[in-house]
């Protein structure tokens, strides 16, 4: 495990909470709240129906199931055994078919049955939890078909994100369990763009995601100071 791009402490955080993944009133409420926004953002740009999609860091399967319900053929990967068990069980209960696997993206990229075979790769709310995000992005890019699309989301690294994403979300509003995030692991959009370009992808769009603590509503917009999504594309001919 030492040579894998995995932080066991990060995995342990989500293992401990896994049984509550599909409870929209639990610690995962923020994920439930933003999932429709993320899903629509992706579907509007690639039209998921009939596409082959890979969800990297799928956790309990919220996004994976959502993409499958939009008609995509989805593979979801994660290194957390408990979240994957929850994802598989929920899929059986809901009748939504997703191929879940316990593996890292770097390992899957070495499998010729998967490398270069996906129209869409998503890596949402995951990159701030791994030791080497650039390695993840390179491996994700290698999974794309020519002309394929990649979507990433994470948290910006600046004083405002420390105030909002850690102090506010974890200690004041109690939206997330304390210790969910480490500020030093947050990734600036400029850094994310560099990672994507070095992986051979063209950045197409940067979009912010904000939370209003009064209305308790998330929305997409231009403010990328805290949470943001980025859309990139493989530049090879389809």
From Swiss-Prot:
Transferase in keyword set: yes
EC id: 2.1.1.222, 2.1.1.64
Pathway: Cofactor biosynthesis; ubiquinone biosynthesis
Reactions catalysed: a 3-demethylubiquinol + S-adenosyl-L-methionine = a ubiquinol + S-adenosyl-L-homocysteine + H(+); a 3-(all-trans-polyprenyl)benzene-1,2-diol + S-adenosyl-L-methionine = a 2-methoxy-6-(all-trans-polyprenyl)phenol + S-adenosyl-L-homocysteine + H(+)
Ligand binding (S-adenosyl-L-methionine): 38, 57, 78, 124
Gene Ontology terms: biological process: methylation
InterPro entries referenced in this protein's UniProt entry, alphabetically: SAM-dependent_MTases_sf, UbiG_MeTrfase
Family annotation (Pfam families): Methyltransf_23
Keywords: Methyltransferase, S-adenosyl-L-methionine, Transferase, Ubiquinone biosynthesis
Gene3D superfamilies in the cross-refs: Vaccinia Virus protein VP39 (3.40.50.150)
GO-annotated molecular function: 2-polyprenyl-6-hydroxyphenol methylase activity; 3-demethylubiquinol 3-O-methyltransferase activity; polyprenyldihydroxybenzoate methyltransferase activity
Family: Belongs to the methyltransferase superfamily. UbiG/COQ3 family.
Function according to Swiss-Prot or TrEMBL: O-methyltransferase that catalyzes the 2 O-methylation steps in the ubiquinone biosynthetic pathway.
Protein name per Swiss-Prot or TrEMBL: Ubiquinone biosynthesis O-methyltransferase
Organism expressing this protein natively: Marinobacter nauticus (strain ATCC 700491 / DSM 11845 / VT8)
């Amino acid at each position: 495990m030492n040579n894998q791009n995995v932080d066991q402490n990060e995995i342990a955080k989500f293992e401990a909470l896994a049984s509550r993944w599909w409870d929209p009133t639990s610690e995962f409420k923020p994920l439930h709240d933003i999932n429709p926004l993320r899903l629509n953002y992706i579907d509007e740009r690639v039209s998921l129906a009939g596409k082959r999609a890979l969800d990297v860091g799928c956790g309990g399967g919220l996004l994976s199931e959502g993409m499958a319900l939009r008609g995509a053929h989805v593979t979801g990967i994660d290194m957390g055994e408990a979240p994957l068990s929850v994802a598989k069980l929920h899929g059986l209960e809901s009748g939504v078919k997703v191929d879940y696997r316990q593996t890292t993206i770097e390992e899957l990229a070495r499998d010729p049955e998967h490398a270069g075979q996906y129209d869409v790769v998503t890596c949402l709310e995951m990159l701030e939890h791994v030791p080497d995000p650039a390695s993840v992005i390179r491996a994700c890019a290698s999974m794309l078909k020519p002309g394929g699309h990649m979507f990433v989301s994470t948290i910006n690294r600046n004083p405002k994100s420390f105030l909002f994403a850690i102090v506010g979300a974890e200690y004041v509003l109690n939206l997330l369990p304390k210790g969910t995030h480490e500020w030093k692991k947050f990734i600036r959009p400029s850094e994310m763009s560099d990672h994507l370009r070095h992986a051979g992808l063209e950045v197409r769009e940067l979009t912010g995601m904000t939370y209003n603590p009064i209305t308790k509503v998330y929305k997409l917009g231009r403010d990328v100071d805290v949470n943001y999504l980025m859309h990139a594309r493989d530049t090879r001919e389809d």
